[in-house]
Amino acid sequence: LEHVSGHHIGRMPDDQVLAALQDYLSETGAPALTDTQRSRILATMGALKEKAKTLPGLLDQARFAMIERPVAVEEKAARNLDTVSRGMLTTLTAALQHGSWSRDELEQAAKRVAEENGVGLGKLAAPLRSALAGRTTSPSVFDMMTALGREESLARLQDQTDLAG
C-alpha cells in the first residue's frame, strides 16, 4: 500500500500534493501552513516527493520548512554540533554571505570549507543538517538552503554558531 501511495504522490503535480498536505493537516487538527511554509515546501517538493511513501512521511521530511527559529535541535543531531563542527559552520556562514544562492554555488562553497578543514563534505553536511533542520534526517542540505533562502539559512546557522561562543 505504501508503494502505491508513494507512486501516486510522485506522479501528482506539486500543487496537488501541497493541497493534499493542507487537507491532511486540516483533517488531523494541525495548524494550516503559512504562506512562507507553503513556499518553502513547494521549493523542495521534487526532493520531498522522491522519498515520500505517505503524506505523513512527506510532512516529516518537510519539517525543516515548517519550524521557526531558533531551531530546537534533537539530541542525536546535537552530537553533530561540537566545537569543531560549529567552527566549520562559522567559516561556511562567512563564505555564504555574498555569493550566489544557487544549489551548485552552495555546494561548491561547502566543499571548499570542508577541504580547508581537511574533511570530506559529509563531515560538514551533518552539522549543517543539524543546524538547518534540527535533526539527522532531511532533504539534501543544499535543497533545504535554497528552499529556506539566504536570510533564513544564514540566521539558522548563526543561531548555532552563536552557541559555540
Predicted regions and their residues:
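Non-catalytic terminal extensions that flank enzyme cores
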Residues: E2-G29, K111, A147-G165
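Short helix-capping/linker segments at secondary-structure and domain boundaries
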Residues: I9-M12, P56, A133-S140
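Core structural elements
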Residues: E2-H7, G46-T54, V119, S130-G134
